[in-house]
Structure formats: C-alpha cells, structure tokens
C-alpha cells in the first residue's frame, strides 16, 4: 500500500526541507505538513493542515522547561513533534516522514505492521514511522498524554532495572 505522508513543522521551511517534500510528492505520495501557522511557498502537491486539530499547541506548555522567557526552544519543538507523530498514528493519518527525509522511490507499507527507520545498528529511529492505530506503543502514548505528569510507565532511564535491555517491548 502507498500511504499518505504526514509531518509537522514549526517555523519557516528551508531549501533542504522543500526539496525533500518535493521528493515525497514525486514518489507518488499525498503529502501533508501540519503546522500552527500557514506555511508559505510549499511545493506543488504538498498540503498544509492545522496542527491544532491533531494536538493543541497548549500541549507544548507541558513540555516547556521553566525559564524566564517562556520561548519555544528547539528541543521543546522536537519533543512536541514526537507526541504529535504518535497522535497522527493513533488517528491512522499515514506514514510519518521527517521533513528532511529525501525519497528516491515510493515507500510501500503493510498497514497492519509497524514500520521504522534504523538510525544505527540496534537503534530504531522515528524519522520514518508507521504504526497501526491499535499498536501497543500508540496506545501507551495516548495513555501517557492523558496523565498529569508526562512520565512513561516503561523504561526510560538507567535508574530502571529494565532499562538495560537492548529494546523495550510492549506486553503481549
């Protein structure tokens, strides 16, 4: 199956991201960039959708470090996009590609199976991501976002004995 491609962007898009978005359209994918502000000059065939409808901007406040200016920092945007992509997976919106992923050919997936990119040997990344909406990780993220504290119930630090595993696997 040739999935729709979805991504999130905050701020102006540079030439590299524009080229990558063009490559995704040229590969035959329907591409949608979600943002809080309208994005000018998107390549032909790339749609722009309102991010607020997926995950409200107010959610970013839960990620913001305490600081005097309260401005978004790069890492706050990165963390927000991690939650945003999982919300897109929960809604079955399509294949997540970071805006700097260049495609040379279409990406075909089996919609019933997870799809990840390898960043390093033995380390999955989330720059290319597809998860069925009923996947355990998607369900866990949805539950996490409903909590007052954004503390995951799965291993995330070396203080947790299970964190020494090579990868976390959801219970079956």
Give the location of each predicted region.
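N-terminal anchoring/stem segment of glycosyltransferases
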Residues: 1-57, 133, 167-168
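Short helix-loop capping/hinge motifs at secondary-structure junctions, enriched
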Residues: 134-140
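Short amphipathic alpha-helical segments and helix-helix/interface helices
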Residues: 18-22, 85-86, 104, 161-165
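GT-A fold catalytic core of metal-dependent nucleotide-sugar glycosyltransferases
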Residues: 77-124, 128-133
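Aromatic-acidic/polar surface patches that form glycan- and anion
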Residues: 10-17, 74-82, 152-158
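Catalytic core and acceptor-binding pocket of nucleotide-sugar-dependent glycosyltransferases
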Residues: 142-172
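Active-site-proximal specificity loops/subdomain of glycosyltransferases
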Residues: 39-83
């Amino acid at each position: 199956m040739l999935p729709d491609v979805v991504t999130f962007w905050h701020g102006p898009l540079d030439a590299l991201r524009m080229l990558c978005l063009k490559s995704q359209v040229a590969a035959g994918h329907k591409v949608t960039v979600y943002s809080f502000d309208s994005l000018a000059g998107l390549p032909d065939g790339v749609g722009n959708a309102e991010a607020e409808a997926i995950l409200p901007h107010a959610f970013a406040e839960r990620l913001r470090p305490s600081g005097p200016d309260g401005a978004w920092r790069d890492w706050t945007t990165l963390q927000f996009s991690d939650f945003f992509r999982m919300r897109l997976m929960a809604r079955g919106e399509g294949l997540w590609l970071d805006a700097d992923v260049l495609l040379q050919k279409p990406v075909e997936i089996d919609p019933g199976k997870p799809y990840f990119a390898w960043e390093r040997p033995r380390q999955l990344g989330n720059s290319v991501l597809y998860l069925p909406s009923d996947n355990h990780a998607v369900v866990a993220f949805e539950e996490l976002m409903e909590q007052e504290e954004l503390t995951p119930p799965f291993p995330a630090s070396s203080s947790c004995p299970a964190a020494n595993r090579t990868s976390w696997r959801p219970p079956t």
